[in-house]
Structures are given as C-alpha cells and as structure tokens.
C-alpha cells in the first residue's frame, strides 16, 4: 500500500488529501500537524492516521509539504537528515518556487530522493482543516516545476489543470499577477486610511470599486510576508516598474493630454477584456458582472434566463455608484458556462455584461 504523508493540514493540505482519497482510496494518507488539527482531520476522514514527523517521513512514498514557505525550507532541512525510502518523491504547495527548489536540489543531490516543486493556485476566504473542500482545485492551475506522471496520477482527483513551469519563471509570473497585487491592495488601504484623517468621508464613500481593488488586503499577513521575502528581487523590480507607469500617467494628467489619458483607459480596458482571468489565490469561479436597473423583479428575470446553469454563487451589489447603477455578480464553475450565459443575457436583455 502506497503511503502519502501530508505535512500541514490546513485548507490546502486537507483539500489535497480529500482529492487523493477520492482518486486513490487504496492509498494510506498520513497527516502531520498540531495534535488538535490532526484529530479533526482524522475524525473527518481527511487522513487515515496521524503520525509523528520522523516516522511518517521514513514510511512515506510521497511527501507533500503544505505549509508556509519559511516552514517548508526548515522542514526540507530536517527531512534530509532522516533515513528515507529510495525513490521517495517530495513536493510542496508554496507560492514561490525558486528558493525552495534550489534548497531541495542541494539537499537531495546524489540521493534517490526526488523533489518537484508544486503550486496549486487555489484558495478561499476560509482557512484551516474545517474548510477542507474536495472541489477547491477544480479547473484551477496547478504548477509543477518538472513533468511528473507520478504526481499527475496522484493528484488527478483534484481535477486541476497541470502546467509545467520553470521555478524562476514561475516566480516572475506570480510576482506580477499574485504577489504584487497584494502590495498594491494593502498600499491603497494604507493610503486611504491616512487620507481619511483629514477627509473622514473617505471611509464612508469607499464603494464597490475600492472594495474590489482592496479585497485581498485582508489576506493572511504572515503568509504574504513569507512570500515577499522569498521572492524579493522580482517584487522590488515590479514595484519600480509600477512607479514608472504611474509617472507616465501623472505626466499625461499634468499636460492635460485628454487624448493620451483616454488612450490609457481604453487600452487598459482592451487588455483586461482579452485576459483569460483564472483563479489565483482566490476561489475558482468565473464571474459574470451584469449592470442592472433598479427595478422590481430584475434579479429574478436574470436568474430565470439562467435556470439551466449550475451557478456557484450570486452576489447583489446594492450600492449606488456613479459608474454603475446596480451590479449583479453571478459565479460559474466553468468558463464555458460563463460564456454561454453571457450570450443568453446579451441576447435577451439590454443589460451591460462584463
């Protein structure tokens, strides 16, 4: 019987465990975490048994590290000192890859232990073992730093989209689309809070646009500190690049260059619309935003058009904003459903759909 050791039974680790158990009920899932977390995971059937780190690592055929980056680095150093099985495969679930892969390659060079970096690009506003979700990774990108049929087979129950990406390129890409946006969100919150000291209405008038831009500022502070310190060069380079773009639009405003400013927004809109927005560290939904009039029955009218679809979530934005009258957000699990729903709504109504 193949034994899988999962170290870290939070949202990611426990959700991975559920996916493995679904696809491979014959495998034994060992779990290592704090005792109270292990007990919950075992009681809920997420793991088959709890195990002490050394014993579990020595018995395991595959080890999955689902812990913060700094902890992953320390665990790799510990595990490398254990008497491990020949052919052991180790992977992780960290948000950066270069530092982890480089250390693992140093530690296991010349051994029969194989390390392949992993990054399931999925998450939730919930956390911990109680938030374990079998469907968390469905249709989400799952990055591997090397091709591995063994990992693909192990994790097939997650129904994720596996892509192979060099560790350094991974950190460059995620540095732009994942790490840097968290800096922007928190910076905007800090800036607004500071500005509100002289202009108190800032906090009252911050509406949908501000909320959407800053939502990720509520993310785990310890985790994101670890992420940034594991990818500092790319992070700093992206900050400098962003300063350059801000300076460019500032110059356009200074010159009162309306044509250039309009081009700035128009091109930004086109680029955004052309992007295939997938899940990053957020729920794996494909969101449709519908601007609707403030009329009785309008929401039911839209939902009636979509009665044959599998809808993951519905959110009604009741705020009155100068740029959007009212907004209905409908989330789908599949991109195909989103596109079909968009076409149906655009054909049956005159509502703006984005």
From Swiss-Prot:
Reaction(s) catalysed (UniProt annotation): prephenate + NAD(+) = 3-(4-hydroxyphenyl)pyruvate + CO2 + NADH
PROSITE patterns registered for this protein in UniProt: ACT, PDH_ADH
EC class name: oxidoreductase
InterPro entries, per database record: 6-PGluconate_DH-like_C_sf, ACT_dom, NAD(P)-bd_dom_sf, PDH_C, PDH_N, Preph/Arog_dehydrog, Prephen_DH
GO biological process: tyrosine biosynthetic process
NCBIfam families (UniProt xref): PRK06545.1-3
Entry protein name: Prephenate dehydrogenase
Organism, as annotated: Lactococcus lactis subsp. cremoris (strain MG1363)
